[in-house]
């Protein structure tokens, strides 16, 4: 343990002398208050420390003690349904200790040391095990089975394994290694947050992460193990999009990081999630969620840690063979924390004052996502999908954080303030956004939902692009100057926008749409467009076409409950065909 003394305090940055034996990224305890900090720069025996708690009142001469270990998180039963701060201190436990206002210098363990968990072994004495092998299971919540794994670097034969109720620190198994050492295994592991957890092999994504949000699943889908960014100006709905994805994405585990955003937004999550039911299991959404709250009024340095803490917890569940979705809201606040610390370290600034290493830090974060073959002899697969919100000032997508993010991610959902002001939510601009997973996911949907999905999707995008071109003409000469065919295109685009892409996050049916219902809705809206073209060719007037009674039913189709989709949509399709045929027959006479 290395001990030094403070020589300078500058906001969250503390400089200490006499730290020659300390190492980069060691956790230190600063002053008599024992504040948690991390060494981020070394010059001889001088260490620059970013402190994760309030530094007011600190002064030169106070002691700094290095623990000799990097910033690590505790991984084991008790993570699910919990809410932590950026350095994995449980906020519920802290509230019990000091009340609602967090005071500094609190030392509390992340996992409850007194709670007993029912451990059921899945291996027996004499079995050979290697790092990553599942040796037992704990039913953590009614829907999450926590798999206890052999820690990294341990390999050998099971010498002893127990069954029953244990705390996370009690030994549940003993492994005799090849060097004849006896290693105790408990239900808890520790892992340094800045180092990605190892896996055997990285695989390309092969299936969609179904979110239930029509504009995402249909036009700009995200794959399990993929990376996406949601940039947008203030008030365009980034947080609601993130909440919707956290609620309805078909992942087994959701890790939600509130990094430098408003405290009220985390309150919304805490209030809504326990009341909402998971469409797959019918259980509360909190039973599969881990929350990390690092709101804008908490110390800046802890924002950087919160992103890594969340990613490490997500990787741990991925290693069990689960599909995990990680939401980071917002990576811009994290980048601002990097900029502040870089400025205090007097480093050479890059573009707009951000440090020159901004791009590499963002890449380190996003590259930890992916679909992998986990460590262990059973060859199980896990997937970690990362979705980061970006808050560019004034909605300027050319600023450094957005540009650095765009170089890394494969799905871009660009939020548009003009759509938000028109009350069109989710305000994802269909002309700016893109997804590079279309080929993989199109193939999966063609095999599992319908073969004409890709045709419907490409026709939808074509109609929306044609609408953007026609809008310019309409502004100049008015809609009446257009040909009937162009007017039909405009009407179809309006129907796609208002009846399909627009989705009410607060309506109990419309908030989530299954892939089958999305396919039926799109087929119905485009069915009107295709039939309308035939009717126009047969001489039907555009006015008669627009006044068809079935059009109101098409507009209300999104409110059809999931269990009535096939019967209700078959009826509407039948009505549409009958009414179009009646118009054509009338013209022929």
UniProtKB/Swiss-Prot annotation:
- InterPro entries found in the cross-reference section: ATP-synt_VA_C (IPR055190), ATP-synth_a_Xtn (IPR031686), ATP_synth_asu-like_sf (IPR023366), ATPase_a/bsu_AS (IPR020003), ATPase_F1/V1/A1_a/bsu_N (IPR004100), ATPase_F1/V1/A1_a/bsu_N_sf (IPR036121), ATPase_F1/V1/A1_a/bsu_nucl-bd (IPR000194), ATPase_F1/V1_b/a_C (IPR024034)
Keyword Oxidoreductase in the entry? The reply is: no
From which organism does this entry originate?
Acetivibrio thermocellus (strain ATCC 27405 / DSM 1237 / JCM 9322 / NBRC 103400 / NCIMB 10682 / NRRL B-4536 / VPI 7372)
**Could you mention a single GO BP entry for this protein?**
proton motive force-driven plasma membrane ATP synthesis
Superkingdom, natural source: Bacteria
Write out the entry's keywords from A to Z.
ATP synthesis, ATP-binding, Hydrogen ion transport, Ion transport, Nucleotide-binding, Translocase, Transport
Under the heading PROSITE patterns, the entry gives:
ATPASE_ALPHA_BETA (PS00152)
Described function: Produces ATP from ADP in the presence of a proton gradient across the membrane. The V-type alpha chain is a catalytic subunit.
Q: Name one GO cellular component term.
A: proton-transporting ATP synthase complex
Query: Which NCBIfam families does the entry mention?
Result: PRK04192.1 (NF003220)
Q: One MF term from GO for this chain?
A: proton-transporting ATP synthase activity, rotational mechanism
What reaction gets catalysed by this protein? ATP + H2O + 4 H(+)(in) = ADP + phosphate + 5 H(+)(out)
Name of the molecule in the record:
V-type ATP synthase alpha chain
